[in-house]
Amino acid sequence: MSTGSTLNQRSGKPVKLRASCDFCALSKVKCDRGQPQCVRCIKSGIDCNYSESRRIGKAWHHCAPSAVRSTSATTQGTRRKQQTIAQHSPRRRIHRDTQALSAADDAMSPYDPSGYATPFSMFHTLPSPVPESTIRSQTHIESYPSLDGTMAPILCSPESADISLPDIPHVAQLRTNELEGESPSVLQYNPSWDRIMAEHSTAIGDAGDCITRAAAVLKSVRDPRTSCVRSRTPPRSHTQSLDATLDDGRTAMDTVKDILACPCAQEIRVALLLVLIIQQVLESYQALLTQQHDTPREESPLGINLSRYDTPMAIGRYLLDNELRSKIIVQVLSSELEKIGLILDILTRHAQSMAHQPDELILGTYIDSLQTTKKEVLESLEQGNDI
């Protein structure tokens, strides 16, 4: 009864989470404590998990010998009471009472892992095809402590005992392979911890996630009027609207900016994809201006007839005329081109740091050509605005 009520009281308390997520704690970096996911985990493309917090880094039954002694005294008192009841009961109930006493002893044992708030398997939450019972036989705790009051060996590792490793594929595979071939006595200190921490701290990002995002954005900003011969979708013959062009371009450049904040941008494959995205955005802006140059200038006071796109603009009840609307569109395009120029500057610095990679020269040449294209579009906007 006392054990059950204690468990109910413990389970009724709100679970307190750690201040740092598992990924930041494993990487030994400061966590921004974002809920439900911190910024570092979002940029790295992994699941953010906050483990249950404890006041000290060891399991509670390792650090509370007084609780073990009090529980043992309660168990002995219950046993004496049940023995007294068994002596005064009829002889035909002796066998049944003995069975109940044995079951009560098992339920009240202070070393039963099911009675703890956190089971012993908390130290091995990584996905593994091996059953939990088999994993327990391979853990750091070789056996449960005996009734003489001896404590189980303390878990020795570079991190606190309450850390639950995140689901990082290469870490999980390495740790599972090590557990299968080593005995519990050898696992008290594993030198591979240092290697895992060093490897993980230098490769925070996942190139696959950034490449997937970049490829999706590249597909969205691709010129819809051009089509591959293998494509089942026919190319569009009409021009994309002004608002759709600006919205797609801004979304694409925001994604490029996010990817540049990830260490994956230091890889040549990711950098080339980002350059392709910027090229598509610049070409969409160029096509927007080129088509307007082909219209008669009598239709608009400006040399660039951006008012051809029937995009209503108003400030409250004040509806803008064609001249004001064209000027605003020119300012918006100029602002977007300036943002592209800043991103190209960041890509240029990344290309300079890739001097040891064979494709660095191609990347640098590509970026220079985009800088030239950006300047030409800006000059075209300025000339049209001056007319």
Curated annotation (Swiss-Prot):
GO terms for molecular function: DNA binding; DNA-binding transcription factor activity, RNA polymerase II-specific; zinc ion binding. GO terms for biological process: aflatoxin biosynthetic process; polyketide biosynthetic process; positive regulation of secondary metabolite biosynthetic process. Residues 21-48 bind DNA. SUPFAM superfamilies: Zn2/Cys6 DNA-binding domain. Keywords: DNA-binding, Metal-binding, Nucleus, Transcription, Transcription regulation, Zinc. Residues 68-87 have a biased composition (Polar residues). GO terms for cellular component: nucleus. Transcription factor; part of the gene cluster that mediates the biosynthesis of a methylated derivative of known natural products orthosporin and diaporthin. Positively regultaes the expression of the non-reducing polyketide synthase aoiG and the O-methyltransferase aoiO. This is Zn(2)-C6 fungal-type trascription factor aoiH. It comes from Aspergillus oryzae (strain ATCC 42149 / RIB 40) (Yellow koji mold). The gene is aoiH.
